[in-house]
Amino acid sequence: MAGLRVLLCLGALLARQGSAGLQLLLNPSRANLSVRPNSEVLPGIHPDLEAVAIGEVHDNVTLRCGSASGSRGLVTWYRNDSEPAFLVSFNSSLPPAAPRFSLEDAGALRIEALRLEDDGNYTCQEVLNETHWFPVRLRVASGPAYVEVNISATGTLPNGTLYAARGSQVDFNCCSAAQPPPEVEWWIQTHSIPEFLGKNLSANSFTLMLMSQNLQGNYTCSATNVLSGRQRKVTTELLVYWPPPSAPQCSVEVSSESTTLELACNWDGGYPDPTFLWTEEPGGTIMGNSKLQTLSPAQLLEGKKFKCVGNHILGPESGASCVVKLSSPLLPSQPMRTCFVGGNVTLTCEVSGANPPARIQWLRNLTQPAIQPSSHYIITQQGQSSSLTIHNCSQDLDEGFYYCQAENLVGVRATNIWLSVKEPLNIGGIVGTVVSLLLLGLAVVSGLTLYYSPAFWWKGGSTFRGQDMGDVMVLVDSEEEEEEEEEEEEKEDVAEEVEQETNETEELPKGISKHGHIHRVTALVNGNLDRMGNGFQEFQDDSDGQQSGIVQEDGKPV
């Protein structure tokens, strides 16, 4: 052993004179070998250059001794730990330290079944005319043996695919084990080109706060050994789901053959599509589990109900439902319509309550074919409202009943409208008639006023004739005509007495008649002759008094 140490010291002294700037790159099978100056060597020995070799666990690696090829001198390999450890030599008297170590051509060291503990510094000693030392750095890489991906998704499909609810928070984590620690990267592929998300050593985690539809795709985590370049990756598909925004809508439609009805359950706006279940109500008899359900003729009954239950993967757990009810059309009664000869008229028919929607037709008679649109008949329909416009009305052709018929596969209803066609109105005749009626009414009012209020008309007449306002006038209401006929004889007697008094009055002096007049008005008051006589007597007394006064005044001296 003392002799070996002497040889090592001599070799170190000779190696100091070599070139220090040489770099060597070798690429043996499954190993990379490079040479770097001034690296670690045996204690107390400064080499000219150092090579770096890389191998993987369980693989084989070859470490070359310098850059020379061909025949070599005595070559010996050492492992540089705290103290140099002999591995193998051309000297046959020195057996290898382990069967895994052997020498190849040109003094290269072959190590089989690499282990992690093989990582370290190695030195090749060549003794020919002089001794040379060639240090080699061996790096042993391991893994990555696995890649573990964890995604905190909402749920997992039976095939293992993950899904997350739109708007939720999703955490991503990827880890791997390797020697040295691997470089971990995240990629996402939503379309054709992957997008890089980030990288880190050993593990990589990130969080997406609000999942959206454009974040649905394949997420890939890759772990790469920075020494060996070995890479492992795991790709996980993540789907983004969302439920329909509103409740399902049930409807009934006529089939393409127009012979039966189809139930439709629409619950759109979600992803993926929901599932459906149709039941017959009441009773809950299951009919089918498709979006469209065909009804049999026996099920086309008035008031029949059917229920659709929709289920989405994101809930609600009990599902969302809607109910559809079959019903025949309803038609309100229509009033009579009138059209003038040569004019136009529009008949309107409003249908309500029909499910499915009804087909509306216009007929002149329920046994005749439906009215077809033409220049004479204009038919317009908007939704469940239909209008029939008749142009150039004719009394012979168009007057009569018109039927509005509404029909669906549940039932049929009809209502009739009577159309009366008349001649146009004479406006001039109407105006003349109105004016005549107004004049007639005015005459009647005037006559009634004259009959019941004669004083008003008498005073008016006297004023227009310029009579003296000092005239004496006595008005006595008259009795009804029937009583006048019965008391006609009594009136004649009274008239004779009045005439006598009048004659006496005419004998008064002429001066009296110059300033005053006495008007005689005789009437029968309620057939009471005594009352009338008393009134007349009072009138006579007043007249006598006036006459006496006048005579006295005339007797005065002038």
Curated annotation (Swiss-Prot):
Residues 37-140, 144-235, 248-327, 332-420 form the Ig-like C2-type domain. The chain crosses the membrane at residues 427-447. Residues 21-426 are extracellular. Residues 477-506 have a biased composition (Acidic residues). Residues 477-515, 532-558 are annotated as: Disordered. Glycans are attached at residues 32, 60, 121, 150, 159, 218, 344. It is a single-pass type I membrane protein. Residues 1-20 form the signal peptide. One of its GO terms (cellular component) is membrane. The keyword Glycoprotein applies. The keyword Glycoprotein applies. This is V-set and immunoglobulin domain-containing protein 10. It comes from Mus musculus (Mouse).
